[in-house]
UniProtKB/Swiss-Prot annotation:
The lineage of its organism: Eukaryota, Metazoa, Chordata, Craniata, Vertebrata. The gene is IREB2. GO terms for cellular component: cytosol. RNA-binding protein that binds to iron-responsive elements (IRES), which are stem-loop structures found in the 5'-UTR of ferritin, and delta aminolevulinic acid synthase mRNAs, and in the 3'-UTR of transferrin receptor mRNA. Binding to the IRE element in ferritin results in the repression of its mRNA translation. Binding of the protein to the transferrin receptor mRNA inhibits the degradation of this otherwise rapidly degraded mRNA. Belongs to the aconitase/IPM isomerase family. The keyword Iron-sulfur applies. PANTHER family: ACONITASE/IRON-RESPONSIVE ELEMENT FAMILY MEMBER. This is Iron-responsive element-binding protein 2. It holds the Pfam family Aconitase_C. GO terms for biological process: intracellular iron ion homeostasis. InterPro entries: AcnA_IRP_Swivel, Acnase/IPM_dHydase_lsu_aba_1/3, Acoase/IPM_deHydtase_lsu_aba, Aconitase/3IPM_dehydase_swvl, Aconitase/IRP2, Aconitase_4Fe-4S_BS, Aconitase_4Fe-4S_dom, AconitaseA/IPMdHydase_ssu_swvl. Ubiquitinated and degraded by the proteasome in presence of high level of iron and oxygen.
Length: 965
């Protein structure tokens, strides 16, 4: 969007920023007065956007005043919102950029200047999603080698060595199988422990480069080859369209880094300042609210509308204030706190609302904590969870490499418009729809087990709870061990040393990151605890099967850049590769002596892991008690060697000089954790990321793309085609034409989803899309999915209503078929629609309640339009989909209350005629006449003048295109 809308009625409140006279901004706090001062921070962002983008048509003065009157208007009015930018994924980016390329073509053909066609706001498109795997990563790469001996070495390419941390000695011969020389994979117990991500990592024992498996490199090459055409189109887009940046594949950015790298927090466009805000098709879009950036996920057609300069519309939401107080327990990890907060929010019924955090406890949460909470909105149903910018945010941005001068301007601006939150409790907090109070001190760390993940046990009750499990009858928790046998000890000889096993002994300890990727600080906490333990002289018994599975390159970066990997290794937590190896039970077998001792003494041995599943016997058939715990607690229980320990009163073990070491002595404080995270990890991570972004990658840099302002469409392409949305584009829209003698293409029931309308999965071999691709010379293996072919309107039109579960009442059973009434033939939906179009017969759709349920999907509106559908007549609609129909030029009509096809005696075999008056008005009624002589009234579901204008123009694409003529 433009920083300054020409002709805005609010230009008199534009001011210069104090101490920065060259910087200007809308001082919305002066306009709003005391009403503004009590608005939630998130609503203040909506208000500023409405003031800055007010043009009297798309955004009216009444919209701005409705937002200012949020307290009385919440839930009652619809308001427009013009986000500052858009984030797209490759799947949703293809159709959006294809539409822009087609619009340029149409504008040129209609006599306009195609170079003027550009996204109206900054648009970032990430091309970092693997679409297909050609070479298996071997799901059991960590399984035991039953044949024994040396496993065959795969050909591998070495990752570059980033640095040489201080070497620490190995635990002993049992856990070290020889030197990890260049070109050789590290082995433990005869298994490969190779990474499966393109991220440099060192062998944790010998600090040598770990190779990348050949399969990864092959997959990357195959993926690049398969997607070359689309990648060339993206590269062309980045060259010719203003406001467009493409994040190329293999950049290796996790969602958090990706979103933070793209985030501005405050926009500075030609010295005009305004808050950052975003909508995106990525499900992780809400994560940016943890940085004080208002944003949420929408469908592809909504993001495209924003790119076209249109606002998104939302019902002015309730805002739930979440007050955080108290101090977190020392043993509570970030994940404990995050899960504790999300649990409270689930119980608070915040679905469909904004959540905003305030209170003294907010400053205890790092930005990683905040973004994780914000990212978990789907867990508790909120639209977003907003953390206003504060000193913690600024400190984080400083460590990510934000320019200091920009930070100073940012802080001054946010304070000027009252969008900056002070750490201390303010005398005047915003007024919220409701307040949920959460005391951080009430969040107690738990473990789950011993058999089911839903059986949670407070860590301080663990010893007594395990004792209860021994006593209870065999069942969901109990083991029914006789009282006289509960203190049995079984001696065992292992590697020349004598050990004792008893009930509760830990024999498997696995630090797994599959549930911790969005907040790697808990993995860092495990590493810092390991460091302190090693420095204190603590060890892990060698018979305990320990392992470390980082889960992602981001977690590896946390562990390696902070220098804790060698300490984890010293305790036996050796990297076993990326992937949930221990989660799915692929751990190395326990030593035979240990297995025999457990079975001989009928010992209830324990596994402790930080995964998600702990079913009995999952890790090993002789390990009957399995607990899920946070990564640092996994390390702590491994050191203790038993779960029958009270961490408050009993030491983990004996350190140097015979000193008893308690958990509190080595547990990292939250301050320590945040300091290491911000100063060591975050700063180096963003430095590396920016270098990678500036350098690009070899394949992307060498990729050739056209230089012309118009895209040279390849008529042979099966991925990218110029769509026909603009075929009738002229400077002025044609007057509304009646829909005369329309046949019903489909007669559908209730709850028809967008997936019924436009499936995203694989292309069935018998489908119309498959026939088209076969005629283009493709084999079934090359069909790919509908999602991958969203840039080809011919495939997507043929895929419309191609879901095999579609229930058309004309057919009577689930099938993507319908009847072509003039001929009486039963055909594929596309074939019937094609015949109707050749005959010049318009078609409509009859449907029941909740038409268009499910995820927003652009082709669920575009597809029916290209099939020739002029109107949908339903009992009710999913709101977003109804707006999408208008946005593409299809009339959404609704039966009057109490009426439906059955009550009106409609069979769907009639022909329907719909007359439009010369002037449409919001929510007006229209008359429909059938070929049988029946006349009935329906609502035309146009909510406002904007929707009527879009419909008259044939949809938003044509409406915007006409602006360039």
């Amino acid at each position: 969007m433009d920083a300054l809308r020409p002709g805005s009625p609010y230009q008199p409140i534009i001011e210069e920023l104090r101490n920065y006279p060259q910087k200007r901004f809308y001082n919305v706090s002066k306009l709003g007065g005391t009403k503004y001062d009590v608005l939630p921070y998130s609503i203040r962002v909506l208000f500023e956007s409405s003031i800055r983008n007010c043009d009297g048509f798309l955004v009216k003065e009444t919209d701005a005043m409705n937002i200012l009157d949020w307290k009385t208007k919440q839930n009652d009015v619809e308001v427009p919102f013009c986000p500052a930018r858009v984030v797209l994924q490759d799947f949703t980016g293809i159709p959006a950029m294809v539409d822009f390329a087609a619009m340029r073509e149409a504008v040129r053909n209609a006599g306009g200047d195609p170079v003027k066609v550009n996204p109206a706001c900054p648009t970032d498109l990430t091309v970092d999603h693997s679409l297909q795997i050609d070479f298996s990563k071997c799901a059991i790469q960590n399984a035991p080698n039953p044949g024994g001996g040396e496993a065959q070495k795969p050909t591998a390419k070495l990752s570059p060595l980033k640095g040489q941390p201080r070497k620490l000695p190995c635990r002993g011969q049992s856990s070290c199988k020889g030197p990890c020389s260049a070109g050789e994979l590290s082995r433990a117990s005869g298994q490969f422990s190779a990474q499966i991500e393109n991220t440099p990592i060192l062998c944790p024992f010998h600090l040598q480069p770990v190779p990348e498996p050949e399969t990864v490199l092959k997959n990357q090459e195959m993926e690049f080859g398969r997607n070359r055409e689309r990648l060339q189109f993206f590269k062309w887009s980045s060259k010719v369209f203003k406001n467009t940046s493409i994040i190329p594949p293999e950049t290796g950015m996790a969602h958090q880094v990706n979103l933070e790298y793209l985030s501005r927090v405050v926009f500075d466009v030609e010295d005009f300042l305004y808050p950052d805000s975003v909508v995106g098709t990525d499900s992780h879009t809400t994560m940016v609210n943890g940085l004080g950036i208002l944003g949420w996920g929408v469908g592809g057609i909504e993001t495209e509308a924003v790119m076209l300069g249109m606002p998104v519309t939302l019902t002015l939401p309730e805002v739930v204030g979440c007050e955080l107080t108290g101090t977190a327990s020392p043993l509570a990890t970030s994940i404990d706190i995050v899960l504790g907060i999300t649990k409270h929010l689930r119980q608070a019924e915040v679905a469909g609302k904004f959540v905003e955090f305030f209170g003294s406890g907010v400053s205890q949460l790092s930005v990683a904590d905040r973004t994780t909470i914000a990212n978990m909105c789907p867990e508790y149903g909120a639209i977003l969870s907003f953390f206003p910018v504060d000193n913690v945010t600024l400190k984080h941005l400083r460590h990510t490499g934000f320019d200091e001068a920009k930070l100073e301007v940012m802080e001054a601006y946010l304070k000027a418009v009252k969008l900056f939150r002070n750490g201390e409790s303010s005398s005047r907090e915003p007024e919220y729809s409701q307040v949920v109070q959460i005391s951080l001190s009430s969040i107690i760390p738990h473990v789950s087990g011993p058999k089911r993940s839903q059986d949670r046990v407070a860590v301080n009750n663990m010893k007594s709870d395990f004792q209860t499990c021994l006593n209870e009858k065999a069942g969901v928790k109990g083991f029914q061990i006789a009282a006289e046998k509960q203190n049995d000890v079984v001696p065992v000889q292992y590697e020349g040393n004598q050990y004792e096993l008893s009930h509760g002994c830990v024999v498997i300890a696995a630090v797994i990151s599959c549930t911790n990727n969005c907040n790697p600080s808990v993995m860092l906490a495990a590493g810092l605890l390991a460091k302190k333990a090693v420095e204190a002289g603590l060890e892990v018994k060698p018979y305990i099967r320990t392992s470390l599975s980082p889960g992602s390159g981001m977690v590896t970066h946390y562990l390696s850049s902070s220098g804790v990997l060698p300490y984890l290794s010293k305790l036996g937590f050796e990297v076993v590769g990326y992937g949930c190896s221990t989660c799915v039970g692929n751990t190395a077998p326990l030593p035979e002596a240990i297995r025999n001792a457990i079975k001989q003494g009928d010992i209830i041995a324990c596994g402790v892991l930080s995964g998600t599943k702990n079913f009995e016997g999952r890790l090993c058939d002789c390990v009957r008690a399995n607990y899920l715990a946070s990564p640092p607690l996994v390390v702590a229980y491994a050191i203790a060697g038993t779960v029958r320990i009270d961490f408050e009163t009993e030491p983990l073990g004996t350190g140097f000089n015979g000193r008893s070491i308690y958990l509190r002595d080595i547990w990292p404080t939250r301050k320590e954790l945040h300091t290491v995270e911000e100063e060591c990890v975050i700063s180096s991570m963003f430095k590396e990321l920016k270098e990678k972004m500036e350098k690009g990658n070899k394949r992307w840099n060498s990729l050739e793309a056209p230089e012309s302002p118009l895209f040279p469409w390849d008529l042979k392409s099966t991925y990218i085609r110029c769509p026909s949305f603009f075929d009738k584009l002229a400077k002025e829209p044609v007057s509304l034409q009646p829909i005369e003698n329309a046949h019903v293409l489909l007669y559908l029931g209730d709850s028809v989803t967008t997936d019924h309308i436009s499936p995203a999965g694989s292309i069935a071999r018998s489908s119309a899309a498959a026939k088209y691709l076969t005629n283009k010379g493709l084999t079934p293996r090359e069909f790919n999915s509908y999602g991958a072919r969203r840039g080809n309107d011919a495939v997507m039109t043929r895929g419309t209503f191609a879901n095999i579960k579609l229930l058309n009442k004309f057919i009577g059973k689930p099938a993507p078929k319908t009847i072509h009434f003039p001929s009486g033939q039963t055909l594929d939906v596309f074939e019937a629609a094609e015949l109707y179009q050749k005959e010049g017969i318009p078609v409509i759709i009859l449907a029941g309640k909740k038409y268009g349920l499910g995820s927003s999907r652009d082709w669920a509106a575009k597809g029916p339009f290209l099939l020739g559908v002029k109107a949908v007549l339903a009992e009710s609609y999913e709101k977003v989909h109804k707006s999408q129909l208008i946005g593409i030029g299809i009339a959404p009509l609704q039966f009057l209350p109490g009426e439906n096809p059955n009550t009106l005696g409609l069979t769907g075999r009639e022909q329907f005629s719909i007359l439009f008056p010369p002037e449409l008005s919001p929510k007006m009624t229209l008359d429909i006449k059938t070929s049988t002589g029946k006349v009935f009234s329906v609502f035309a579901l146009f909510e406002n003048d904007v929707e009527i204008t879009l419909y008259k123009n044939g949809g938003s694409l044509n409406f915007v295109a006409r602006r360039f003529l």
